[in-house]
Amino acid sequence: MAENNTKRGPGHGPGGPRGGFRKPKDLRGTLSKLMGYLGRYKALLVIVVILLFISAACSVAGSYLIKPLINDYILPGDFIGLAKMLCVMAGVYVVGAVCSYGYARIMVHVAQNTVAKLRADLFNKMQKLPLKFFDTHTHGELMSRYTNDIETVSEALNNSFASLISCSLTFVGTVMMMIVLSPILTAITAVMLGVMLLVVKTIGGRSRRYFAAQQKAIGAVNGYIEEMIEGQKVIKVFNHEAAAKAGFTGLNDTYRDAATRAQAYAGAMMPAMGNLSHINYAITCCVGGLLAIRTGDLGGLSAFLQYTKQVSQPITQISQQVNTILSAVAGAERVFEIMEAEPEVDDGKVTLERVKENPDGTLTEANYDTGAWAWKKPDGSLVPLRGDVRFDHVVFGYDDRKIILHDISLFAKPGQKIAFVGSTGAGKTTITSLINRFYEIQSGTITYDGIDVRDIQKDSLRRSLGVVLQDTHLFTGTVADNIRYGRLDATDEEVEAAARLAGADGFIRHLPDGYQTVLTSEGGSLSQGERQLLNIARAACANPPVLILDEATSSIDTRTEKLIEKGMDRLMAGRTVFVIAHRLSTVRNSKAIMVLEQGSIIERGDHEDLLAQHGRYYQLYTGQAELA
């Protein structure tokens, strides 16, 4: 809408790091919702848990087999038995490796399908949200839900959940076997593990703080870069390159400092844990060696030392995986916030349908474009569509504290062209958005052929309205596909006819592949005027009974505007047309011109009547005032 600026804000771009740690607000509730998505894979998840148990058991058992390997075969010199035992150990490790591969593959399948469903549900939910929702959420914020947050969930499902269970099982199994081998050495190791846990908590806590600062800083950098890229022309016109560089340097330095501190603490974790592990190993060797001399259990000492190496690894990994999972749950929570947002309300029962007239004069529904429409009431009766649109004392505001439109009343008949003139923010686009029911009014009524638009299903209502917005938007695809977006079942001939009607056929045929020329997003290879012509052709393809032109020629030069005037007149013939004017020359032939100021209609009449009033319209037309 013209009155609303596009929501873009720094700090929400998709390029932000995922290293920052975020705790979920409702851990249990969000996990429950995630489990709802994973519930379809219960059988596979049971298999994963079984494979995890087997894999962890093999890892623990493999180390324990070192004891009989040394005591029963190496020391006695039983090399045949040694060979057999080596084969047993190899078999144990092979089984563990196969199980690890198996659960990893299954989790990839489960994770990717779950994330695909989550992403699809999020996208589908977006299509059901009212425009008011997008007015209060930045583009970058919404994109981060699709990218950062869902990717964090994917990463956790792919690796972290299974790894957390595996590490926990391995840790418990290892500690149990250490107690079996030597309670004394286990007590020594437990003391060192306590020190390790303290180090993990201290370093991890500070690391998370600085990673959060890093994430905030990179968000600010991304937002600034996005803003500067979009505003390059303005920056160069006003010669503000130096100021732009200075602003970026400050943000970049802040990010550098935050990232340096975050990475310094994160990088200290592994060396600290490694050194503590080495100290623990050395102490265990000394004490264990003395015990082995007394008991002669060299194999038990060797097995215990192997467990000593293993036991510290799960501690670090469990801490890392827990943080990753909590971040993923926080990301999922943000996704579910959108999914639980209030959808667009549609209580309409009346529908608009394409119809054909039978020889006896009755109407029947048609599944192709007949150029005729009718209301289909709840009782199934069909009433021809006329195209009368009436506003009766309409009051509207985006919220109750800020009213945008005050007591708007107007009436438009088929074949009439109603124009809206006024300064930016006067409420011109808002009026046409209310016809579409993009927003709900506070009071008053808007009727379409005498039927309250709130009683009409929104999809049917919008299908009957052709809209050419002031902001052109083209999709990646062919020229024909972009025109056909107005009516997906349009034939190639109908697409070309719509282009000729809009005056776009000429330049389209000069494109490399004509109507099959592939356009990039937003039609970057076309001029602004050419993009707008395709927008107008799209509306012509829809062949609607009511047409809304939201400053449709504001981006077209005067020469191009002259080329399409006749086509636009043909497009508007017989239709109810609402025009939001950027150039007053485009509304001279309007049946009625509404002059708006601060949300109220202050003047109305045709061109000659308004000039005779010597009011606001007269000032605008004669150049005594400007459309600012």
Give names to the regions the model predicted.
Residues D78-I80, K84, M177-V191, R261-E333, ...:
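Helix-loop-helix
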Residues M1-S59, I74-V88, Y103-M107, A111, ...:
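Membrane-integrated ABC transporters
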Residues G19-L27, I50-L51, C58-N71, F79, ...:
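Juxtamembrane helix-loop junctions of ABC transporter transmembrane domains
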Residues L27, L31, M35, V46-I47, ...:
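Alpha-helical membrane-protein architecture signal
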Residues L122, M126, I235, V335, ...:
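Helix-loop junctions and hydrophobic alpha-helical segments within the transmembrane domains
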